[in-house]
Amino acid sequence: MKISVRSALMADKIKDLFNGNTIDGVSYEFSGKQGIELLFDVTGDNIENLDVVAITKSAIKGTEYGKGLYFSVTVK
């Protein structure tokens, strides 16, 4: 499964937050950048039953910079 995180700001910090990390059972690997869009391959046990978008949004909002950041997360 792939997800897209779109944000005009803080792309490097978002990439560092997820790349090679596992958050709430979801493992992220950076797969590319297209403009303001960061693409990640996501894997995990029982991934089809996890709300990957909500987990990703929650992780960004939990950062110091994420509270005021405009971004979107979608499944590709």
Task: Describe the role of every protein-language-model region.
Residues L17-N21, I55-T63:
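Conserved short hydrophobic interaction patches
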Residues V26-S31, K61-K76:
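Conserved short beta-strand edge segments in small beta-sheet-based binding/regulatory domains
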Residues S27-I60:
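Short, intrinsically disordered low-complexity segments
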Residues A11, F40-D41, F71:
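Generic detector of low-complexity/intrinsically disordered segments
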Residues I3-S4, L38:
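Contiguous segments within soluble domain cores/interaction surfaces
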Residues S4-G25:
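Short amphipathic alpha-helix segments
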Residues S4-A8, S31, T43-D45, T74-K76:
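A structural detector for beta-sheet-dominated domains
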